[in-house]
Regions:
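Helix-loop boundary and gating motifs at the non-cytosolic
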Residues: 1-32, 188-234
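Transmembrane alpha-helix termini and helix-breaking/packing motifs in multi-pass membrane transporters
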Residues: 11, 64, 123-145, 219-221
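Juxtamembrane intracellular "pre-TM" segments in multi-pass secondary transporters
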Residues: 159-196
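Helix-loop junctions on the cytosolic side of multi-pass membrane transporters
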Residues: 138-172
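C-terminal ends and interior cores of transmembrane alpha-helices
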Residues: 55-69
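Membrane-interface helix termini in secondary transporters
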Residues: 38-39, 43
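Cytoplasmic helix-loop-helix junction between adjacent transmembrane helices
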Residues: 78-120
């Protein structure tokens, strides 16, 4: 949905200002829900949290073609952000501890390398196909993305929860990690300069990739297929 979500929101009676607000709240929500997601994973199990994450994301993307207006899209975007928060850490921990339990730590790096390549390839193909499919039916990219989430949900039922838990969540440990991270940033002039440089560059790069590129291409008059192709090329580069 990367090359078409902006025009889709506009089509659904969401203004540009409201889209900006939705995106801001969505990422704030994702950040806020990172904290309780770790505690819930320890209470309910990482596998169950990932299942809940997939269900929330499926609901969000399945209903997007059927709603219109600011409030419905805001609610669905928040659901999607909670799903992303629940899935991000728990899924990685589930895989990491599974390899750790099998005494195969070296296999983790190979898996991450392979999965990242597949992920990037999927983003490229998804961007190119998304623009084309949108011209056929503007809901089609959302249906197909929902289908991919359903496949992920089904695959997750075959996960085996590892008996070990390498990282036990606690608020104290979470706050200690934040404190140590801040100390690391400000420990020397060099680390401060490097940290602020990456924050500055990352802020520009990520907002451009996730938001401004799409807006600018629409304003410049690129059609749906062209935006999909250019989004795929930018991801490849």
């Amino acid at each position: 949905t990367a090359p078409i979500w902006f025009v889709f929101y506009l089509l659904k009676d969401v203004s540009e200002a409201q889209i900006s607000l939705i995106v801001t709240i969505q990422y704030l929500s994702q950040m806020i829900w990172e904290l309780p997601s770790g505690a819930l994973a320890d209470i309910l199990g990482r596998k169950n949290i990932v299942i809940i994450a997939f269900i929330l994301s499926i609901i969000a993307y399945l209903f997007m073609p059927f709603v219109s207006g600011f409030i419905p899209f805001l609610i669905l975007s928040i659901l999607s952000s909670i799903g992303d928060s629940f899935r991000s850490g728990s899924e990685e921990a589930l895989i990491y501890d599974s390899y750790l339990q099998d005494d195969n730590e070296k296999g983790i790096d190979k898996l991450y390398l392979w999965s990242n390549n597949i992920y990037q390839l999927g983003l490229i193909l998804g961007a190119v196909l998304g623009g084309y499919l949108y011209t056929i039916n503007n809901a089609l990219p959302f249906y197909l993305y929902t289908l991919s989430l359903v496949i992920g949900l089904i695959a997750n039922f075959f996960y085996i929860e590892p008996k070990i838990d390498s990282v036990k969540f606690s608020v104290e440990n979470y706050l200690l990690q934040i404190r140590d991270g801040i100390k690391e940033i400000f420990k020397s002039q060099q680390s401060r300069l490097i940290s602020f440089f990456y924050i500055f560059v990352g802020g520009i790069a990520w907002t451009s990739t996730l938001y401004f590129n799409e807006v600018m291409m629409v304003e410049l008059g690129f059609d749906d297929v062209q935006r999909g192709v250019y989004s795929g090329i930018m991801r490849l580069i």
